[in-house]
């Protein structure tokens, strides 16, 4: 990736600007031209063509460069103060955050149970296929709550002998299991609703129970909406999965209620049609969730911009680094594993080389996206690949 000549040996007591000429530096005077901050007309954003399309591409390029320089600035701060953020949360603040996350999860599970009981009663009273589809969705909320609680609980009990690299992979696996069950349920509702439409089979609804159904389903939608807002205030992936689940419930409850009311007031077939809409929405949404989480488990590479950011950090880590042979970052769960090969002088004492490699590893693992970093130290870079070739 790059190399540099020898830049003076010996220990450095203090560093001046002249001593740091080996470092990569980015300027602070780069700004996106003002004309690219302005949004093009609405029609041009929908159908980019001609000069507007070119303007959009150039603005995107400048924005990308601006973000890259911002990343470089963060890496410089990390090299200077030893951490990414001087305002990083303390241990007490982290404990408070964890306490808040547990409260959000427990509150979601308790409310899901209460609302599920209410929706079961609404389903029994209305016999609406759309309401039943929404109720079955709430049943899976309870199942998802158990799966996500179990994965969160398991991740908090590490076992370095049985699970040497931790249990963080349990999080996407739990989400995949839940999403698969959600998709299966949606498919079953789709089949039953289609059967009702084909056979012209439907239930006669009692108008006296209409207000009770409206109150029950509306209350569920309102409660779920506020739960969604609360859970979205957290950064924890499991809590945010709950937020996504609550958002789905707002949609399915609203569609189920509207479909049932339209079926009562106008045409009976609007009820199974609403159930089909809920089923299709459930299947497509959770299929997308499965694809996203499977992608985190199969070792997908980090974006080129992130690898560039890592390379900048590695190069500026220590003056004695002669060459960067390899920089890899790939998903193995929700975070990245990073592999780095650096070249140091061949006559450097082992203890000194070890300290440089270990401090670089610790620095890389401070990045919030990185779960584990592996730093390999070598004295030359002309050798053949050291790992078994891919078949």
Curated annotation (Swiss-Prot):
The keyword Transmembrane applies. It is found in: Vacuole membrane. The keyword Transport applies. Its main location: membrane. GO terms for cellular component: membrane; vacuolar membrane. Belongs to the cation diffusion facilitator (CDF) transporter (TC 2.A.4) family. SLC30A subfamily. The chain crosses the membrane at residues 104-124, 135-155, 172-192, 211-231, 247-264, 267-287. Residues 1-103, 156-171, 232-246, 288-391 are cytoplasmic. Residues 125-134, 193-210, 265-266 are vacuolar. It is a multi-pass membrane protein. Keywords: Ion transport, Membrane, Transmembrane, Transmembrane helix, Transport, Vacuole. It holds the Pfam family ZT_dimer. This is Metal tolerance protein 7. Residues 1-21 are annotated as: Disordered. GO terms for molecular function: monoatomic cation transmembrane transporter activity. Involved in sequestration of excess metal in the cytoplasm into vacuoles to maintain metal homeostasis.
């Amino acid at each position: 990736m790059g190399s540099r000549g020898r830049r003076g040996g010996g220990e450095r007591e203090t560093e001046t600007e002249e001593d740091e000429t080996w470092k990569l530096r980015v300027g602070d005077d780069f700004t996106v031209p003002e004309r690219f901050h302005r949004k093009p007309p609405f029609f041009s954003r929908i159908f980019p063509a001609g000069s507007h399309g070119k303007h959009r591409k150039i603005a995107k390029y400048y924005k990308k460069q601006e973000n890259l320089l911002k990343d470089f600035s963060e890496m410089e701060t990390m090299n200077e103060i030893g951490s990414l953020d001087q305002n990083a949360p303390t241990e007490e603040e982290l404990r408070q955050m964890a306490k808040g996350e547990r409260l959000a999860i427990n509150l979601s599970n308790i409310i899901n149970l209460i609302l599920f009981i209410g929706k079961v009663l609404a389903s029994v009273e209305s016999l609406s296929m759309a309401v039943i589809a929404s109720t079955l969705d709430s049943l899976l909320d309870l199942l998802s709550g158990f799966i996500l609680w179990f994965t969160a609980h398991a991740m908090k009990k590490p076992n370095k002998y049985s699970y040497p690299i931790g249990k963080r992979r349990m999080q996407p696996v739990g989400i995949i299991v839940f999403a698969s069950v959600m998709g299966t349920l949606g498919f079953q509702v789709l089949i039953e609703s289609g059967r009702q439409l084909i056979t012209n089979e439907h239930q006669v609804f009692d108008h006296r129970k209409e207000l009770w159904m409206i109150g029950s389903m509306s209350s569920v939608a309102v409660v779920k909406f506020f739960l969604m807002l609360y859970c979205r205030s957290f950064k924890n992936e499991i809590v945010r999965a709950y937020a996504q689940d609550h958002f789905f419930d707002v949609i399915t409850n609203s569609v189920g209620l509207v479909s049932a009311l339209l079926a009562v007031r106008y045409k009976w077939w609007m009820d199974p049609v609403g159930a089909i809409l809920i089923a299709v929405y459930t299947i497509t949404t959770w299929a997308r969730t499965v694809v996203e989480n499977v992608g985190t488990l199969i070792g997908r590479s980090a974006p080129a911009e992130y690898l560039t950011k890592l390379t900048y950090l590695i190069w500026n880590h220590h003056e004695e680094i002669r060459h960067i042979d390899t920089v890899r970052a790939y998903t193995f769960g929700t975070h990245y594993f990073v592999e780095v090969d650096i070249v140091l002088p061949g006559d450097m004492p082992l203890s000194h080389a070890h300290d440089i490699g270990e401090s670089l590893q610790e620095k890389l693992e401070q990045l919030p996206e990185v779960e584990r970093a592996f730093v390999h130290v070598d004295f030359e870079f002309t050798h053949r690949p050291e790992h078994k070739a891919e078949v």
